[in-house]
């Protein structure tokens, strides 16, 4: 998994709207949150929480992108259903998840499987990781990320 002071990969990913290129957003802070599956309870709550704080993130010159393995069409339905404002990346080939180290072995009811570990990366204007949240607990998380951005300053 990427760590503080690592440079983020200069990835390009399809979203439900258009391709998202990290290189187009250098000069802004970037929040990248990885979530397991669109339109499930925790992922919905997390995405709505970031949407509810969108104006505050915008004022701090910060772009937000949520990434899951869902295809762009599913991300589009997810956006429309909940009026989400953050970018939604479709990593259905698992390239970005692997680059960030969030594609991990998980276990549920004794069954092991591979999946996305809910994680968030805060990057500065140069694309350097400044904070990492692993195994994110959704309640209060978006607020915590916003506070970390404020602490980074301009």
Predicted regions and their residues:
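Chalcogenol-based redox active-site neighborhoods
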Residues: 1-154
């Amino acid at each position: 998994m990427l760590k503080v002071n690592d440079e983020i990969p200069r990835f390009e990913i399809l979203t439900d709207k258009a391709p998202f290129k990290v290189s187009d957003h250098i000069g802004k802070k970037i929040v990248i949150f990885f979530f397991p599956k669109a339109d499930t309870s925790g992922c919905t709550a997390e995405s709505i929480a970031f949407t509810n704080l969108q104006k505050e993130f915008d004022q701090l010159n910060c772009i937000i992108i949520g990434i899951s393995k869902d295809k762009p069409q599913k991300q589009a339905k997810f956006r429309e259903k909940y009026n989400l404002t953050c970018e939604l990346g479709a990593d259905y080939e698992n390239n970005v998840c692997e680059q960030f180290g969030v594609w991990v072995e998980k276990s549920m009811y004794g069954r092991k499987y591979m999946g996305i570990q809910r994680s968030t990366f805060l990057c500065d204007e140069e694309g350097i990781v400044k904070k990492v949240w692993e195994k994110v607990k959704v309640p209060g998380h978006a607020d915590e990320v916003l506070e970390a951005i404020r602490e980074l300053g301009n």
